[in-house]
Amino acid sequence: MKLKMKTTLIFAALVASLTLLSCEQKRTLKLYTWTYYTPENVVKAFEKEFNCKVVVTEYDSNETMYNKIANGGAKSFDMVVPGQDYISIMLQKDMLQPINQELFTNRNLISQKLIDKKSVDREMIYSVPYYFGASGICVNKKKVPAGDYERSWNIFADSRFKGHASMMDDYREVIGDALAYKGYSVSTIDDKELAEAEAIIHNEWLPNIVKFDAESFGKDFARGDLWLCQGYAECVYGEVPEEEWDETIDFFIPEEGGPSYLECMCILKESKNVDLATEFMNFMHRPENYAQFLDGFRFPCYVNTEAEKYMTKKPMYPASILDHCEAKVDLGENLDKYYKIWEGIRIK
């Protein structure tokens, strides 16, 4: 009896030891990314397949992310998802490490059209595209009939929208829109071109704009307070009931283009789980997984060439309207030119 009990205790101790060892060996991937940007079901599927734990910490801006990483947070995370203008800065500061191309087997699924728009790291040595998008224009068709207005950034000069129009509180976006309307690069540093953009905003657009806002414009549009707004489609569509989308919202990006953003997955130089981070990039770009991300936000398929066939929901807008958009680049010290223009606009 004692022998049996002793054997049982030894077996129990062995099981406990193996369980503890298993827990100790379970890897943890620490992902620092945008708020609500990673589908929970995809994360859980990754955890199950790779026997790991994913800890997601969220940020609301590139500036927040960068400041945290630059001020002692680099060792706290494995991966980040910065905009490409910040990728440029992080590469200069030696914050990122190269991606193991042998593990990133889904590289061939990244759209060449998208790669051509990359202004930084087109070879994808340090960054894997996650999402490409742009702000656009939303018109409330209940207030102004569709087809009865200019489908251009200069729609903000239309006095019918006076007191019911808003633009984002973002100087690269607003000034970039004016530059695109004039036919210039959204990242120009030419003083003459910037002066022309400033004049358009001051003289033509500003008289009709009730506020600059990057947070509540979706709610204001849904309430009917705004008839015209510049912003991200998901912020408006997310506030208007889906059954009212077609009759209420006309979202478009003008043919003259405008500023766009490209956010990419990157591995930090201090990462403790480099291979696992690379596997996560590869996992996200399995077409069926990437389609879940797109469906979750009703985004169009622009980055991954095969994901569209797995999508189950109609996107808010067609991917083709992004073709004319230009990715913003880091302007370094020349950013002050934009900031000074913006100060003058905001004062008025």
Language-model features and meaning:
Residues 23-90, 219:
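Early extracytoplasmic/lumenal segment of secretory-pathway proteins
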Residues 310-348:
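Extracellular/periplasmic bilobal clamshell ligand-binding domains
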Residues 76-77, 82-208, 215-222:
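Extracytoplasmic ligand-binding site segments that recognize negatively charged/polar headgroups
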Residues 263, 268-325:
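Mature extracytoplasmic/periplasmic domains
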Residues 59, 82, 167, 212, ...:
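Short beta-strand and adjacent tight-turn residues that come in two discontinuous sequence segments
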Residues 194-204, 245-269:
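Periplasmic-binding protein-like
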Residues 1-29:
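Short, low-complexity disordered leader/linker segments with a strong preference
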